[in-house]
Amino acid sequence: MANEANPCPCDIGHRLDYGGMGQEVQVEHIKAYVTRSPVDAGKAVIVVQDIFGWQLSNTRYMADMIAGNGYTTIVPDFFVGQEPWDPAGDWSTFPEWLKSRNARKINREVDAVLRYLKQQCHAQKIGIVGFCWGGIVVHHVMTTYPEVRAGVSVYGIIRDSEDVYNLKNPTLFIFAENDAVIPLEQVSILIQKLKEHCIVNYQVKTFSGQTHGFVHRKREDCSPADKPYIEEARRNLIEWLNKYI
């Protein structure tokens, strides 16, 4: 079974040919990609990378999509200058690579990003969205930072520990039915534990026939059968942010 200490490999999927609408900035000790909302509503969303890093065009595309819905978005380099995973890399070395990129040891970076959003972007309401590795970050943040009003964890691997179910604010979990990284058994455990321990609003949604990465690493035009699920998941993501931020 996949878990945070021994995850299964995931394919990069379709790398989008996308330039981006934002700009790269320095946020204290880390770099970040920031897109300002065309409407200054005092709302911001932290968008967390997958294992392929903060410069992946697909993640920036998602950040810009969210920004177009009224949020200033920021994609921080949560690897803090360390190299992202190489899609052509030897997966046998992945566990060792991951040791220095612990998705639950990012509080210093989160603190810096929150200061930047409040001081430089005048954000008063903040949410977070993350994909794959970033989905784990979202789960951690939503159990640690009460000031983050809403979270969307997209195919983030689940750790079975009591402390990860005490969510501080509403969180949406998106999974894929045919995910080789996250078995449905893990999703079922998450649902059961949230029922037992969570007192805030949450939703766990599994998309039929989809695979790991379908929300942000699969082109909408790649398969007519997949397109409705991709669009629905992205719509659900935006709706969750709109409802709770």
Curated annotation (Swiss-Prot):
Chain ranges passing through the membrane: none
Record's subcellular location: Cytoplasm, Cytosol
Annotated positions of the Phosphoserine modification: 223
Modified residue annotations for N-acetylalanine: 2
GO CC field: cytosol
EC number, as in UniProt: 3.1.-.-
InterPro entries: AB_hydrolase_fold (IPR029058), CMBL (IPR042946), Dienelactn_hydro (IPR002925)
GO molecular function, one term: hydrolase activity
Primary location group: cytoplasm
Gene3D superfamilies reported for this sequence: alpha/beta hydrolase
Keywords: Acetylation, Cytoplasm, Hydrolase, Phosphoprotein
List of catalytic residues: 132, 179, 212
Pfam families: DLH
Function: Cysteine hydrolase.
Family: Belongs to the dienelactone hydrolase family.
Protein name (Swiss-Prot/TrEMBL): Carboxymethylenebutenolidase homolog
Naturally occurring in which organism (per UniProt): Rattus norvegicus
